């Protein structure tokens, strides 16, 4: 029998894990950026680096659900623009891991995202197209930020939400593109987490297996919410969740 005591030391730890699983399921099927709200709780409960190893397989499982449901909705031109620099972001995260505290980078990322979010909201308020979206550096920058933040703390939800909101694509394309991007990114991360950071093992996988039903519940709720919200309502809701997520990155 697998001993969970090295990771699960109280009932609170199970509650945090299951809440994370519900939020991850919802974020992968419609409620973008919601999963990051559980990142601080996971880090405080399990430790910063162990928590990323616990969360990643849950994310991968939820990605498969999201892609299976929205598989024909993706805008691949955006994914192709993002992926190369996202992989570069992995290596940047590995390089700075032992040099600079992750919290300092998280706050820096939060500040950058807050600035970009402000520009995007200003453009929408003025009724103009995002003035940055066609810049040659825009997609590579978000790819790098996404790869770095997802490697450091599975915290790339707000990065992608801001990027995809700035494209003004329809909600189904938004969710499908997000699902495919993170499916690619999270499965590419697995070897790094297993062999470089050694924070995924049989015990963590067994713990994650207990969270599977809660991922399914969250996925169902996310799908229902996307169907319920009109296009404008979806953008407003996603923007609000993203603002909260950026504040979490800045303040926690």
Predicted regions and their residues:
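Transmembrane helix exit motif
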Residues: 2, 64-73, 108-134, 224, ...
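Small-residue-rich hydrophobic segments that form or flank transmembrane alpha-helices
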Residues: 14-80, 142-143, 147, 157-215
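Hydrophobic alpha-helical transmembrane segments in multi-pass integral membrane proteins
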Residues: 92, 96-97, 147-155, 189-193, ...
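Small-residue-mediated transmembrane helix hinge/kink sites in multi-pass secondary transporters
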Residues: 40, 94, 98, 162, ...
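Residues within membrane-spanning alpha-helices of integral membrane proteins
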Residues: 14, 56, 110-113, 117, ...
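Cytoplasmic-side transmembrane-helix entry/capping segments in multi-pass membrane proteins
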Residues: 75-86, 108-112, 133-141, 173-180, ...
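Membrane-interface helix termini and inter-helical loops of multi-pass transporters
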Residues: 1-7, 94-104, 193-206
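Interfacial loop-to-transmembrane junctions
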Residues: 220-241
């Amino acid at each position: 029998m697998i001993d969970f005591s090295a990771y699960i030391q109280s009932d609170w730890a199970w509650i945090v894990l299951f809440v994370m699983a519900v939020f991850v399921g919802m974020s992968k099927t419609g409620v973008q950026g919601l999963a990051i709200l559980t990142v601080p709780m996971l880090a405080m409960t399990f430790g910063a680096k162990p928590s990323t190893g616990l969360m990643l397989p849950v994310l991968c499982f939820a990605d498969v659900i999201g892609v299976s449901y929205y598989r024909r909705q993706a805008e691949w031109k955006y994914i192709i623009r993002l992926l190369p620099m996202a992989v570069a972001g992995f290596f940047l995260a590995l390089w700075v891991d032992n040099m600079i505290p992750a919290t300092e980078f998280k706050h820096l990322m939060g500040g950058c995202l807050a600035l970009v979010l402000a520009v995007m909201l200003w453009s929408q308020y003025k009724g103009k197209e995002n003035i940055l979206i066609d810049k040659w550096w825009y997609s590579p920058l978000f790819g790098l930020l996404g790869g770095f933040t997802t490697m450091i703390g599975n915290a790339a939800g707000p990065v992608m939400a801001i990027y995809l909101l700035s494209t003004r694509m329809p909600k189904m394309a938004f969710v499908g593109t997000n699902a495919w991007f993170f499916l690619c990114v999270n499965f590419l991360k697995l070897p790094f987490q297993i062999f470089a950071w050694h924070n995924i093992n049989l015990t963590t996988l067994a713990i994650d297996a207990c969270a599977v039903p809660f991922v399914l519940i969250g996925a169902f709720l996310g799908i229902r919410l996307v169907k319920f919200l009109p296009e404008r309502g979806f953008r407003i809701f996603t923007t609000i969740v993203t603002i909260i997520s950026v504040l979490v990155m800045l303040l926690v």
